[in-house]
């Protein structure tokens, strides 16, 4: 999902954001309302995800860990550019 498509959905609470980075990366800064589940823990914690909203997975640059996570979750998408693009880095 592009940043342009994502930001209005986030603003209106229409998506569930899943941050799959490691703990230290998440603590450095994260997208508001994001749930943190590191990619290495996702398979055993997938039951924690909602079924009533589209899920957008996020990592630092987008397309690596977030794409891998999105493949594990039916119907999920990943955020292009990740948190770097979201925060303008």
Question: In which residue ranges do the predicted regions lie?
Answer:
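Rhodanese-like catalytic fold shared by cysteine-dependent sulfurtransferases
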Residues: 1-16, 23-56, 60-89
């Amino acid at each position: 999902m592009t940043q342009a498509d994502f930001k209005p959905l986030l603003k209106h609470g229409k998506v569930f954001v899943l941050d799959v980075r490691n703990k230290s990366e998440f603590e450095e800064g994260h997208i508001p309302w994001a749930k943190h589940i590191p990619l290495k823990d996702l398979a055993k914690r997938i039951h924690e995800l909602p079924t009533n909203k589209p899920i957008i997975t996020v990592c630092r640059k987008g397309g690596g860990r977030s794409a891998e996570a999105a493949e594990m979750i039916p119907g999920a998408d990943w955020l292009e550019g990740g948190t770097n693009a979201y925060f303008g880095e």
